[in-house]
Each structure stands twice: as C-alpha cells, then as structure tokens.
Amino acid sequence: MEQFLIGNILLEADYADVPMVSEGNLRRFSWEGPWTGDRAVLRCAHEPLEPYLASPMIPENHVYGIYTHREQPLLVYHWGNRLHGFAVWPDSFRVSFEPGMVHQPPLREDWFFSICSFHRQLLIRNACVLHASYVDIGGRAILFTGPSGVGKSTQAELWVRHAGAQVVNGDRAVLRAVDGKWHAFGYPSCGTSGICINRTLPLSAIVVLSQGPENQVRRLPAGAAIRALLSATEFYPWAQREFDLALHTATEIAAHIPVLGLVCRPDAEAVAVLKQYLEGADNHDPV
C-alpha cells in the first residue's frame, strides 16, 4: 500500500500488482508513519470489463468514454484494442483493470493519479483543486487564476523577479480550511510549468487576472468572485453532485478570502499595484 499526504488527506493507494513507473511529482508527497486525520483509500482490482470496453462509443487510442452503471458514473480508458483497458469509478474511488492485461510500457504513476478522481475526495471534504499559479510571498500564499493564456505564469514570474517570491506550483493548488483558516497546499500535478513543491501556506488572496492597458486592482463582489472560483475549480461538469460541492466550496472561500480582480500588463508596475493593495494602502473597496 502506497501512502501520500495531499491536502491533509492521507491517500492510500492499493495498485493490485499493476506495474507503475513511480518517478515523478507524486513521490514528493509520500508519507510514512502514523496519521490521525482524513484518509482516502484508492482500491484497484482485476475484473472483466468487456461490457464497457467493447462499446462503440469509445474511439481508439488512449481516450475514454463516460457511462452510468447501476447509477454510478464510470470512466473507461483503453489502448487501441477495445478490450484492453481499465475503468475508473469516481463515486467509490476505485479502478477496475481487465484481468491479465499487460501495460507496455507500465502506467506512469503521476498520470494514473491525475485520472483517478482524487479531486472528488477533496470536494466531499469542503476542499478543492484550483487551476492557478501558486506563489509563496513571505510565507503566505497568493494564487493567480483566470482563463487559459491570460498570463498566470507571467504574473507569477514577475513576482519572483521583482518581489522575491517563489512559485510553489505553476498550475494547481489545493485549497482547504485548517482550524477555520484557509490554506493553500501543494499538488502533484503542475501542468507544463514543471514547478511542483510540496508546501502548505496560509492563503492571503486569490487574484483573478485579465489583460488591459492599465494596471488596476479591486476586490470582486461576491457573485463575480464565486463565478471566477467555480470556473477554475476541478470537477467533472457532467456530475451534478460535484458541481454542487464545488459551488459550496467556492462560496465558502469567497466569504473568507479576498478574491481580487487584477487588470494588468506584463510589467513590474502590475506587481507594485497589487503589492500596494495587499499591504493595505487602498484595499477598502466595498464587497
């Protein structure tokens, strides 16, 4: 049984002798020793999958189909041959492998983690995975989020260059309250950034980026803040329960953490404007 501590949840992974390549970011979160907090057990098993893998709904080559089986959602992955793959059951947090199948090459542990629906284990505990650049500024976390291509990595790197910050994760962070205070946690997936540090920090602010000719910052009203957080939260859009949980978590975060809108250029002044706001010089916008 492999053990990883992610977002204050001890993930216990039983791979059922399925060969895994265990070199990657997930190993940064390995855990040894006792744990008295939340646990999630990922169980893998070998069982026939012909009824699902033979479906014409699944095209060829490393793609998946979404089904409902006995009122449980089911994701089926396969390799070329429709009778060669595995199924992920998000509701029960388990994975079914076709008996006797041989993975050539073996599964990459990081990729397997990314598709095993761990985000749901966070959502049911009032936590979430947020698509954002996670930056450590003096021992506190600031997250830059927004649409793809808006400049999350650019703003994070500007803070590194001009404010002595450090990027903890270039693409994702776990958000969860600890003793009533929201924190940002490291996460094993980091997109194409290549930056993945296992670090937990108190959360100071979430910054929603947009591009513009002038650098301006304001606190977003509650509705806009919740919409921005929800659009950046990882959940299956076809799963109503996950949407409901994600909405609840976004509402809780917006009620306790400043969610700021930063219209910005990719320059040092964008850092200065946001830094001044965060330090309290002009952060008295009505919410």
What do these predicted ranges mean?
Residues Q155:
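Hydrophobic positions on the alpha1 helix immediately C-terminal to the Walker A/P-loop
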Residues K152:
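Conserved lysine of the Walker
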Residues M1-S148, L158-V168, A173-V287:
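A noncatalytic interaction/capping subdomain that flanks phosphate/NTP-handling catalytic cores
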